[in-house]
């Protein structure tokens, strides 16, 4: 695959693509252009076909798998091949919530900041920003709990298992709401100790979010467990 004939063809293609046209629109490859092109190794990359999707897939999977070296390599390949920067940053922003999520919520801030910064900076310096974001996401703790939660809730809605909003949770900020019992029985959490009060927001047993113990999400799990114990204790006193 790296034979001399192929190398010559690749070098010729690079020379033809990088040499500006002459006055009559003819590309004239001189000795210097030919020598420069021979030193360059073409990146096999179809910007709209399999290479485009396979490389971004390898990039995201490397981040998800916590391999910063692989992630930075696939990023370099895409950049060298001329991949659209916005395509890369969109995937980074999605990955920040899909694969890192609540384990490190700052990952979304980093990814979104990178997306904005590369628009302002442009290449070639934008590759530094992309490398920064890529390495942050690859080395961050991982959680897909947000992905699973919205998928499970969406599945129930799509299957027709929709719920009517209970009266105590309905909007009561309009004239006549009291007469219609809108919001009747709602308990305002901030009026209670610790801003915690037992109250039904969904039918019992419905649960979509399961926190992991990865990164920052471990503290979220501890907080939810604490609240649930409080709910049980307060409910038992009634």
Predicted regions mapped to residue ranges:
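Short amphipathic beta-strand starts and helix->beta connectors
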Residues: 194-196
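Inter-lobe coupling/hinge segments of SF2-like helicase ATPases
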Residues: 23-24, 32, 40-56, 67
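C-terminal helical "lid" of AAA+/P-loop NTPase domains
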Residues: 6-21, 32-39, 57-61, 72-77, ...
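Conserved C-terminal "switch" segment of AAA+ ATPases
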Residues: 2-29, 44-49, 99-106, 119-125
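Terminal-proximal interaction/regulatory segments of ATP-powered molecular machines
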Residues: 65-190, 202-204, 208-238
């Amino acid at each position: 695959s790296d034979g001399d004939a192929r190398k010559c063809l690749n070098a010729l293609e690079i020379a033809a693509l990088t040499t500006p046209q002459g006055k009559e629109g003819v590309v004239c490859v001189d000795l210097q252009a030919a020598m420069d092109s021979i030193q360059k190794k073409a990146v096999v990359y179809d910007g709209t076909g399999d290479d485009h999707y396979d490389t971004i897939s390898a990039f995201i999977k490397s981040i998800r798998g916590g391999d910063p070296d692989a992630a930075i390599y696939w990023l370099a390949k895409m950049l060298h091949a001329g991949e659209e920067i916005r395509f890369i940053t969109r995937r980074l922003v999605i990955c920040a919530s899909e694969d890192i999520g609540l384990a490190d919520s700052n990952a979304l801030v980093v990814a979104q900041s990178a997306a904005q910064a590369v628009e302002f900076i442009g290449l070639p310096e934008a590759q530094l920003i992309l490398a920064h974001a890529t390495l942050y996401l690859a080395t961050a703790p991982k959680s897909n709990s947000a992905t699973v939660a919205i998928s499970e809730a969406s599945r129930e809605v799509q299957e027709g298992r929709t719920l009517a909003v209970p009266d105590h949770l309905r909007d009561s900020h309009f004239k006549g709401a009291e007469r219609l019992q809108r919001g009747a029985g709602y308990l305002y959490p901030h009026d209670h100790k610790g801003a915690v009060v037992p109250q039904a927001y969904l039918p019992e047993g419905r649960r979509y979010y399961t926190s992991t113990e990865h990164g920052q999400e471990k503290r979220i799990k501890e907080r939810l467990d604490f609240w649930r114990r409080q709910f049980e204790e307060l409910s038992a006193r009634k």
